[in-house]
Structures are given as C-alpha cells and as structure tokens.
Amino acid sequence: LTDSASTANPSDSPAAPGFERLMYASLCTVKTSVFDEMQRIRAHALKRNVADDVHVALLYQSGWFVEWMEGPSKGVHAVMARVARDTRHRQIRLLHSSHGRRRLSEPWSMAITQTQELPTDFARRVMEMREHHRLGQELDPAAVWRRLSTPLTHPGAREQALNDHFQRVIVVSAHGTDSFDLVRWLGQSQEAEVVHRRFAGSRDDMLDVATDYVDVDTGAVVRRVIAMARNGLQIGLTQAFLSDYSHAVLLLSGDAERDHQLMVRMVAACEQQPRRPVLLGVGSPACKHAELRRLAHKGGLVYLDCERGADDGVAAVWAATEPALDLSLATQSGWPGVGGSGWDRLSGT
C-alpha cells in the first residue's frame, strides 16, 4: 500500500525488534461533521483494533487525515486492509514504516487541528514525507507527525526532527486556564500564530480536551510552548510526545490539594517514558514545593521550583519560567528530558 488504496501489505522486517509502526496520509472525503465522523471511527476502532492489539492515533488537519498505528505486524496489516476499503478517504500515501517501541499508550487517540492552511499546503508536506520514506530516510513516527502538522509559516517548520534546533515545553495548570492564557499571551507578544487543537482518547468517561501551542524563535532555538488541559495528560497521543519535551511547566495554584493532584497526573503520564521532562513548578511562595518535589522524585522525575512572587499575571509567570528554560540551553547534554540533560546533577538527584 503506497500511493493508492490497495490491500497489499507493507514490507515486513521479521528480524527488527519491537512493534511495527506505520503512518499514512489521505484526503478526507467526509462532507458532514468531521469530528462526529471521527467519533464513529473511534467506536469501530475500539472494537476491531483492540482485538488486533493495534494502537492508533488519527489526525484531521486542512482536509487531510493522518493515521499513526503501532502493533504486531499481523494486526497492523489487518487494520491497513480495512483502511484501504474505507470510502471516507482517498489517495492514501504511506509515509512511515519501521519497527521499534510503541509510543502510543492507549488503543485510540485522535486530534483535530485548526489552522488557516489550505489542503494544498498540507499536501506539499505529505509529498515531502512520502519522498523521505521512498528514499529510506525514516524519521521517528513522532517527528513525522510534527513535520506534517506544523504550518509551513512557523519558524523552523522543516526542521522538526532536529532536537538541537528545538526546545519543546508542555505547560499544565493546576486550576483554571492559566496555561492557555500564557500561550495566548506569548502569541500576542511575539506576534506568532497560536495553533488550536482538540485531543480525545479511548476512555468513554472523558470528553475531548483543548491543547494550544505557539512556536517562538528565541534566536538560539525555536521554542514550542504547548498548553495542555489537565485531563489531556491521560491521553495516549499526549503521552507519545512527552519524551520529546525538555520541560513540563506546572502552573501551581497555591491550593495544596489541586497542586498535589496535578503532580500525581504528571507522574502517571511519565511513568512509561524512556526519557522524562524536567518539571518546573511555578507558583507563589505559599506553594508546597517540598511535598511536590518528594512526589516527583518518587516517580523518577526532577523537580525545580520557580517562584513568581505575588503577581500571578501571565507576564510574571513567564518571567519566572523563561530563565530556567534558557539555562537549560547552556547546560544541555543530550536533552530533551532527564537521562543526560544535566538537570539531574544540578538538582542533586
């Protein structure tokens, strides 16, 4: 299965370790609500894909679908055979094929990205990634996903696979929408586009969640700052990218119980990650940093506290956060994340 709908199996490498990982893009033919249709796809996938032990993430953006799947070869091929017969899309393009660890931690995740791009803009990136695949220049599946979903107008859009050119930071607030307020403020102050997305996972008892991001060119690197809803930490697609983040910024509320619950969620989300972001706890002097640090260390995470003073405005929050992010650029050795970042030594863990 390469450039058109076909039931032929992708090439297999029995000697390669881990799960088979495939990614394709296709033109969406859905004429009604795409989100509603993706929910119907989800209901079907949770029955069929689970039986095949295949984990899947589905993206809709600019008139295109992108599907990332991981699992045993037999199961992946069974899913692709069903994909080839599905009339909700056409012009299937295989963009990635490899064997390796499974990044997607749950059977189903999906994302809808809102941008001003035309389908032809997205198509150019699809053709670029198709050519990389044809030439055997395989990137990690997460890097392919980022390359496809990053608008070409963003700084460094074509260099998403180069970690030394990028710093990726996730921001989650213990209460309210502070993380989204911060990203919106960064977009306004830096005159940079804020990209709005919705994520959903496998759980029936959890609604879809918002996640926004902004790409800011600092000169030294392009810094992507991602606002994530608290519930979003439980979604497989969110967890698939955690090992690529240098830091997770926790915007603390000063309410000990809320801050505790946020830390518990973050530790759980990072539990299976081979590399983990450094945690920055940003809050007032009243925050219980010692307890949060204890929880982080128990979960194998580095925790640094960043006090913002009495001012809780977004400018003050960023003023407390940015120096720690900048310092990591000077001390990095194999970041993102813990496992070579140098932060483990700086924090005494």
Task: Please annotate each region the language model reported.
Residues 2-221, 225-244, 260, 297-305, ...:
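Charge-rich, low-complexity N-terminal segments
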Residues 169-171, 250, 279-280:
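Hydrophobic beta-strand residues in large extracellular and virion-surface proteins
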Residues 234-256, 266-272:
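Inter-motif core of Ras-like GTPase G domains
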Residues 254-299:
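Conserved C-terminal guanine-recognition region of P-loop GTPase G domains, centered on the G4
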